[in-house]
């Protein structure tokens, strides 16, 4: 196995602070794992090695570009193959022509020249070494990894004994390890000497050695030729061999790309199957785990009822609508499963099945009545979200059925082989409706029939997994009891676990308990055997088994679970770490002392519960779910297991039964507690994900910005402008003008747009005229403004004032009186959440390579105004980076992505996609994956086929291959997507059908044409004449041509609907309404108007602050910008302007303000008033105010907050502060801050990597702490010992770190210690072997790499977040080897691995390889 491949790996390291050791830098030596992983061995065939080299070269060429200069690459590879074959053929010929010793002796006797040649061999070697010296000198560290040529030479020409040993699997791992001794030189030269010359030269050399002179040579050439006459035949033979070899060794994509790369590009075999199978792509992906599961009719009916009951728990539906609701759910399920229709199709074209319509007689109408004397009362039963829920529930039910089938199969085996007949399994298996209940049954079967199941596995020859072996080992005690005499005492308890559970469930008739004739202790004597040698052991064993039977009873678990959900409560307890870390300004303080939260309360605040669990993960709190009044519940269960008899014996047995029940309930409480806690988490995650979906739907549900005088849906021309994070008037204002078709026609920069004052002879800014000229020339419909700081508000005001004073107007339009008018140009602040992601993206660089990031940002702002839907759809998986709801980051990303995707699917299918526009416009093509029936694979395939068919779709049926060369999809997918792909109607095109430009599905075209004919009052003869002449679309075309669309309003749709239901059994009432609307206005814009941002939204967008992070009453840090005698001006970190009025400057009026404060000083202030519109806040610097921040309002009922614990903790913290109280140390250094470790981390959180804070140390006056940012979220705390101090408050003249490093002052320490380590961290993280992500992610990468390259090894570095200042070196020596990791410590001089220092990454990598090789050698 080639360990050379470790050069192909990557890696990372992270660190995390230990609270008790925050100011110490301790050595961390990770354990070196030396598991004996299986190594792949090399095949000792030079031919195979050469062919592998070819494969690797081909793979590398394709990886580096998909295909780059393919023809040249192929020619080069072919040339290399020819050269190698030529060498191999020459070698075989030499081997055939080898002379044995007798032949050589004979020749030597006849020709003394051979003896002399042999005698000078050693001299020849020395000469060869001499002419190689200059090349040897040039080979340095750069050639460590470039040993391919040397290896190839060795492989081609070296004798087998000179090659690497068969079992030296790590040889290639070392690529060149410091072997520069004479022996290596000699071996390399020997190999070169062994290399033969070219054919022609070889012949001449032989004759020359034989002593022939020039004349003799000429005669020989004349007689025999120069040896190259038949070279053409040899070359033809080589070409044929090459062609055969290419056919045999055809490279598939899987031979070139890693599986992860193929999956990312959707090029796997599975992707191809999804692409071509005639089934909606989303259905295929979702049902992939259950592809082979086929539901019976009975199971299908069961599923419909199961889903309806689940949904009824959360929907408020009138009792009389419950049955219609269940029927509606069943019908939707049929559409989803049997017909394979996606949710948007069902919602759009099967609406009638989601509406319950009843006829209500008109008041006062005669009873005998005319049937027309009634009105229709329609109740909507299901909405779009409900349909997606049904789709999800269908998947859950399939998982349920699959697990049930597995258990049933196990039980069937028990029945057939051991005649098992267990009513518990039979009853519970058929009635189980949740995964938990099925798991209960499975646990029961494996407990009750453990030995039989083991026998079945042995009979079947199945190897039990680790889990099964653990179960068998854990239950061997209970099996001994069950199979021994002691089980008789279990029976003597007088009631089975199942009968007791039946009593507790209040199911059926009560089961009565029988008492034996002896007391438990006395009866136990009769069951003594070899396993249990005395009565107490027997009784103890019997009680344990009976308790375990109760624990394993599915019915008993159901009792406890139901009671738990009814009586569950959540408590939150702070930990020792959380005591100090969570102060009153901390976001977790909201639940630091939260108690007695009912599960119903949690359901109303799902985000709160998820944050509690997050805080628990961080070790700050402990979240406990408990059973309220559990003792009362226990007392209620006692009568269900006790006997009703009155005697001493009965009392003794009842006491024993209660003891058993107590044992069982303790286990059950712990077991159910874990599942309840996890279930609540899942429900809360689902709830938050759905809230995000709802918020995303609202952002998607907005049409393009509507220009004045235009209809909704018209795309505007936009001029977008931004200063980014710059300051208006100082930094350039970037702008981009985007046409309505999305083309960026112009872009540039303005600097000075200030408005002059004629009265004061102040001219306009130098760029005002250029802006006016641009606006008059391009006539945009709107100016969009955004940015990343409050300065954007100033730009907005400046442009608004400019438009007003210069009377700048938008494009003209015709009003109701047919007069051309124009309105003042509107300036709007645009939501920039998509633009922020776009500006630095690869997509932006590809779209506009010459633009800068801020121009990209402006382009995205303009396109957002033109179509928010397209911009959101273009993000793909990056959509999860946008914040929709609080707590969103606590939801599993895949779950969130799935919910957001459904919102996109809903909106894309509401709007529809112009298929021909999608072919030419990438932004529109981004919508195709969300079209009903399609997905990313089918959408790409659709575009490919359309382009193959000429690049234009003339009508919808062409997608099926009708009148087209290739079909783009199958019938089922076409049925799903046809009505959502529209074709712009052109009256001149004879193939165009006007209905292809509507939301009407092709299955309803005949109905639409009939309605159009009736609206035009055409009889059958007129219809026939029109269609014969102009085709089937002629009637609708005539309706549009005559502008008679309004006539369809005169049609009575009820009669149409009744006829369709009566004659064709089709419910189409809602569909008819859709057809009527589409005939009047095809693909009408149904989205809401473009939503302008509210004041709060603008404030949050430009500052990043929300009501939770910045509000009145909070204490925040401010930076002083200007000091006067009566006020102070400052700024918050977020850019909001700060004003400190005179009354709030200080409590010390005897000291001048300028003496108290200095410019650029940062100090805490309490927010008194916040003006979000003008980005201004008033604050107080008075100590009285700052020391008493307004507590956050807590909306808790009595008993839900532990005030006593809160007061106790506050008092304890004050005591600790006072007992350890000393004068706060202040050091005159720009990096000093009076912070603790938490505050230092929070301060450095937004800083750059390598930034530093010097702070007081908790270890005393002779210590300082230095905190520096290693990486995002990772901070190292360094303890600095001060020596040679003048006094307690001065900094020591000598500073020591870790006992190893000494510095003269703080600047010396910062530069030569912290900054030096930061450089080494940068060097590591920029190295090609570094992997972003966790250790698990790096392991995953190594597994993927070695799986794709099984003969290669790999290593990589990753950051170690648990040990700041450390990285992990992860490696895997081949596909079947074990994963290992070694810690790498960052030190000022470089890195430390296994206590060996290395100055840089190259030395570290080589050092690792040597260490690894030595370790392997030691093993052998």
Swiss-Prot record:
Basic residues: bias regions: 125-134
Location of the SH2 domain: 1230-1330
Locations listed in the record: Nucleus; Chromosome
GO molecular function (one): histone binding
Keyword annotations of the record: Chromosome, Nucleus, SH2 domain, Transcription
InterPro entries in UniProt: HHH_9, NA-bd_OB-fold, RNaseH-like_sf, RuvA_2-like, SH2, SH2_dom_sf, Spt6-like_S1, Spt6_acidic_N_dom
CDD domains named among the record's database cross-references: B12-binding_like, SH2_Cterm_SPT6_like, SH2_Nterm_SPT6_like
Gene Ontology cellular component annotations, sorted alphabetically: euchromatin; pericentric heterochromatin; transcription elongation factor complex
Composition skew (Acidic residues), residue ranges: 11-29, 45-57, 67-76, 145-154
Signal peptide annotation: none
Pfam families xref list: HHH_7, HHH_9, HTH_44, SH2_2, SPT6_acidic, Spt6_S1, Tex_central_region, YqgF
GO biological process terms held by the UniProt record: cellular response to stress; G1/S transition of mitotic cell cycle; negative regulation of transcription by RNA polymerase II; nucleosome assembly; nucleosome organization; poly(A)+ mRNA export from nucleus; positive regulation of transcription elongation by RNA polymerase II; regulation of mRNA 3'-end processing
Region (Disordered): 1-104, 117-167, 1186-1208
Main location group: nucleus
Family membership: Belongs to the SPT6 family.
Role: Histone H3-H4 chaperone that plays a role in maintenance of chromatin structure during RNA polymerase II transcription elongation thereby repressing transcription initiation from cryptic promoters. Mediates the reassembly of nucleosomes onto the promoters of at least a selected set of genes during repression; the nucleosome reassembly is essential for transcriptional repression. Essential for viability.
Protein name: Transcription elongation factor spt6
Annotated organism of origin: Aspergillus fumigatus (strain ATCC MYA-4609 / CBS 101355 / FGSC A1100 / Af293)
Lineage: Eukaryota, Fungi, Dikarya, Ascomycota, Pezizomycotina
Gene that encodes it: spt6
């Amino acid at each position: 196995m080639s360990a050379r491949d470790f050069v192909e790996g990557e890696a990372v390291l992270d660190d995390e602070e230990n609270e008790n050791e925050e100011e110490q830098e301790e050595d961390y030596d990770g354990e070196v794992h030396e598991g004996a992983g299986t190594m792949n061995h090399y095949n000792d065939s030079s031919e195979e090695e050469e062919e592998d080299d070819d494969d690797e070269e081909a793979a590398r060429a394709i990886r580096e570009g998909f295909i780059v200069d393919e023809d040249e690459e192929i020619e080069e590879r072919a040339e290399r193959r020819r050269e190698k074959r030529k060498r191999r053929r020459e070698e075989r010929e030499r081997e055939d022509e080898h002379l044995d010793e007798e032949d050589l002796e004979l020749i030597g006797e006849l020709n003394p020249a051979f003896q002399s040649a042999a005698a000078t061999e050693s001299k020849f070697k020395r000469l060869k070494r001499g002419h190689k010296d200059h090349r040897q000198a040039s080979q340095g560290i750069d050639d460590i990894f470039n040993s391919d040529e040397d290896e190839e030479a060795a492989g081609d020409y070296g004798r087998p004994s000179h090659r690497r040993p068969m079992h030296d699997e790590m040889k290639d791992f070392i690529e060149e390890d410091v072997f520069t001794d004479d022996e290596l030189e000699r071996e390399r030269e020997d190999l070169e000497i062994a290399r033969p010359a070219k054919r022609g030269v070889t012949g001449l050399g032989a004759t020359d050695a034989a002593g022939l002179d020039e004349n003799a040579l000429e005669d020989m050439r004349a007689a025999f030729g120069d040896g190259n006459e038949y070279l053409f035949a040899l070359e033809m033979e080589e070409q044929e061999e090459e062609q055969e070899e290419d056919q045999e060794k055809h490279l598939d994509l899987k031979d070139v790309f890693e599986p992860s790369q193929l999956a990312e590009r959707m090029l796997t075999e599975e992707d191809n199957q999804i692409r071509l199978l005639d089934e909606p792509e989303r259905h295929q992906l979702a049902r992939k785990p259950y592809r082979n599961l086929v539901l019976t009719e009975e199971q299908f009916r069961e599923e419909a009822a199961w889903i309806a009951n689940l949904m009824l728990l959360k929907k408020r539906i009138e009792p009389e609508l419950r049955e219609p609701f269940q029927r509606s759910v069943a019908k939707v399920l049929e559409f989803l499963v049997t017909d394979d229709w996606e949710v948007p199709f069902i919602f759009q074209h099967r609406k009638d099945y989601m509406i319950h319509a009843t006829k209500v007689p008109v008041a006062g109408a005669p009873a005998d009545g005319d049937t027309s004397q009634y009105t229709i009362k329609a109740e909507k039963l299901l909405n779009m979200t409900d349909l997606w829920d049904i789709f999800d529930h269908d998947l859950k039910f399939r998982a349920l059925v699959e697990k049930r089938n597995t258990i049933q199969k196990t039980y069937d085996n028990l029945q057939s082989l051991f005649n098992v007949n267990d009513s518990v399994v039979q009853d519970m298996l058929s009635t189980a409706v949740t995964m938990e209940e099925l798991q209960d049954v499975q646990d029961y079967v494996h407990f009750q029939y453990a030995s039989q199941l083991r026998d079945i596995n042995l009979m079947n020859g199945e190897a039990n997994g680790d889990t099964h072996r653990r179960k068998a080992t854990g239950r061997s005690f209970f099996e001994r009891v069950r199979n021994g005499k002691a089980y008789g005492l279990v029976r003597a308890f007088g009631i089975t676990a199942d009968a007791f559970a039946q009593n507790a469930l209040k199911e059926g008739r009560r089961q009565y308990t029988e008492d034996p004739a002896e007391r438990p202790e006395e009866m136990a004597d009769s069951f003594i055997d070899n396993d249990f040698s005395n009565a107490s052991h027997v009784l103890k064993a019997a009680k344990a088994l009976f308790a375990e039977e109760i624990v394993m009873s599915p019915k008993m678990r159901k009792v406890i679970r139901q009671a738990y959900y009814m009586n569950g409560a959540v408590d939150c307890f702070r930990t020792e770490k959380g005591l100090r870390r969570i102060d009153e300004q901390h976001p977790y303080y909201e639940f630091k002392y939260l108690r007695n939260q009912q599960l119903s309360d949690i359901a109303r605040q799902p985000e709160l519960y998820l944050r509690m669990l997050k805080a628990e993960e961080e070790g700050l709190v402990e979240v406990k779910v408990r059973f309220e009044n559990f003792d009362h519940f226990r007392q209620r269960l006692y009568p269900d297991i006790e006997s009703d008899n009155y005697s001493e014996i009965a009392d003794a047995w009842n006491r024993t039964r209660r003891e058993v029940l107590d044992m069982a309930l303790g286990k059950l409480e712990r077991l159910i507690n874990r599942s309840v806690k996890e279930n609540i988490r899942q429900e809360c995650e689902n709830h938050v994900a759905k809230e995000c979906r709802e918020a995303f739907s609202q952002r998607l549900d907005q049409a393009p910005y509507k220009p004045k005088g235009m209809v909704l849906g018209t795309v505007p021309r936009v001029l977008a402008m931004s200063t980014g994070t710059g300051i208006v008037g100082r930094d350039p204002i970037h702008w981009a003008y985007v046409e309505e078709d999305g083309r960026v026609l112009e872009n540039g920069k303005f600097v000075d747009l200030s408005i002059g004052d004629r009265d004061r002879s102040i001219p306009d800014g130098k760029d005002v005229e250029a802006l006016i000229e641009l606006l008059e020339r391009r006539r945009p419909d709107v100016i969009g403004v955004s940015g990343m700081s409050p300065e954007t508000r100033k730009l907005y005001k400046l442009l608004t004032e400019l438009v007003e004073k210069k009377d700048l107007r938008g494009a003209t339009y015709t009003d109701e009186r047919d007069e051309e008018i124009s309105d003042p140009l509107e300036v709007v602040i645009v939501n920039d959440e998509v633009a922020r992601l776009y500006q630095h993206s690869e997509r932006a660089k590809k779209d506009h390579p010459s633009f800068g990031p801020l121009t990209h940002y402006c382009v995205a702002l303009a396109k957002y105004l033109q179509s928010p839907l397209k911009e959101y759809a273009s993000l793909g998986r990056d959509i999860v980076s946008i914040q929709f709801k609080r707590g969103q980051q606590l939801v599993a990303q895949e779950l969130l992505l799935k919910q957001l995707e459904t919102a996109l699917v809903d909106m894309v299918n509401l709007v529809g996609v112009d298929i021909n526009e999608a072919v030419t416009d990438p932004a529109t093509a981004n919508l195709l994956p969300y079209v009903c029936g399609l997905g990313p694979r089918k959408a790409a395939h659709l575009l490919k086929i359309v382009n193959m068919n000429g690049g234009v779709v003339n009508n919808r049926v062409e997608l099926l291959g009708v009148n087209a060369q290739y079909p783009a999809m199958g019938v089922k997918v076409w049925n799903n997507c046809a009505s959502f792909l529209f074709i712009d109607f052109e009256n001149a095109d004879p193939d165009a059908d006007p209905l292809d430009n509507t939301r009407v599905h092709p299955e309803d075209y005949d109905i639409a044409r009939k309605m159009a004919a009736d609206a035009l009052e055409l009889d059958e003869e007129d219809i026939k004449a029109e269609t014969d002449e102009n085709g089937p679309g002629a009637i609708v075309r005539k309706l549009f041509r005559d502008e008679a669309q309004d006539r369809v309003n005169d049609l009575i749709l009820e009669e149409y609907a009744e006829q369709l239901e009566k004659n064709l059994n089709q419910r189409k009432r809602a569909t008819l309404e859709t057809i009527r609307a589409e005939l009047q206005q095809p693909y009408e814009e149904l989205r809401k108007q473009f939503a302008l941002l509210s004041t709060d939204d603008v404030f949050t967008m430009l500052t990043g602050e929300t009501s939770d992070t910045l509000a009145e009453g909070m204490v925040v840090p401010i930076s002083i910008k200007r000091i006067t005698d009566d006020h102070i001006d400052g700024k918050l970190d977020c850019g909001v302007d700060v004003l400190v009025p005179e009354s709030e400057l200080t409590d010390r009026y005897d000291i001048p303000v300028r003496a108290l404060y200095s410019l650029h000083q940062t100090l805490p202030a309490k927010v008194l008033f916040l003006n979000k519109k003008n980005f201004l806040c008033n604050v107080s610097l008075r100590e009285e105010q700052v020391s008493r921040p307004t507590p956050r309002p807590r909306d808790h009922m009595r008993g839900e907050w532990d005030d006593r614990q809160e007061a106790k903790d506050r008092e304890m913290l004050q005591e600790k502060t006072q007992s350890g109280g000393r004068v706060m140390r202040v050091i005159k250094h720009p990096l000093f801050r009076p912070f603790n470790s938490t505050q230092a981390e929070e301060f450095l959180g937004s800083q750059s990597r390598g930034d530093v804070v010097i702070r007081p140390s908790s270890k005393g006056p002779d210590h300082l702490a230095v905190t520096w940012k290693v990486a995002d979220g990772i901070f190292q705390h360094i303890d600095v010992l001060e020596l040679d101090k003048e006094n307690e408050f001065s900094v020591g003249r000598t500073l020591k770190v870790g006992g190893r490093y000494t510095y003269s002052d703080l600047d010396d320490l910062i530069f030569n210690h912290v900054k030096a380590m930061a450089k080494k961290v940068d060097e590591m993280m920029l190295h090609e072997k570094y992997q972003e992500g966790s250790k698990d992610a790096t392991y995953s990468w190594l597994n993927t790499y070695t799986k794709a390259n099984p003969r290669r090894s790999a290593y990589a570095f990753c950051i170690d977040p648990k040990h700041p200042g450390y990285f992990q070196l992860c490696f895997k020596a081949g596909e079947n080897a074990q994963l290992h990791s070694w810690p790498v410590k960052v030190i000022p001089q470089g890195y430390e691995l296994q206590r060996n220092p290395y100055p840089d990454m190259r030395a570290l990598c080589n050092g690792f390889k040597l260490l690894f090789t030595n370790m392997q050698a030691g093993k052998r």
